[in-house]
Amino acid sequence: MVDVLYDDDHVFRDSSRMVIYARRESDYPGNVYYRMQYYDMETGETLLRYDNAHDSDVGHYHRHSGSGVEGIDFENIHDHRLRFLSEVEQIHANR
């Protein structure tokens, strides 16, 4: 049985969408697999994404934005989700 921690999907009125998914997974760093994405559904443009889906040149934990990909600190999935939500709120307010 899969231990899902978060499985959230929200579409905003401006046609942007936020998806947050995380589950316990022993094969991933911190024993958690996650992907958090905020994007424009009309254009497909990624506005913000956090994930640990692969080991990139910037480390296991990374942040994708319009300016590229960068490593990001990871303490725990709860705080990581809150940080993502805060960034989404800021980006959404400026759209």
Regions found by a protein language model. Name each.
Residues 34, 50-53, 64-67, 84, ...:
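Aromatic-enriched hydrophobic runs in primary sequence
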Residues 58-72:
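Short helix/strand-capping connector loops at secondary-structure junctions
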Residues 68-95:
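Short, compact, well-ordered microdomains
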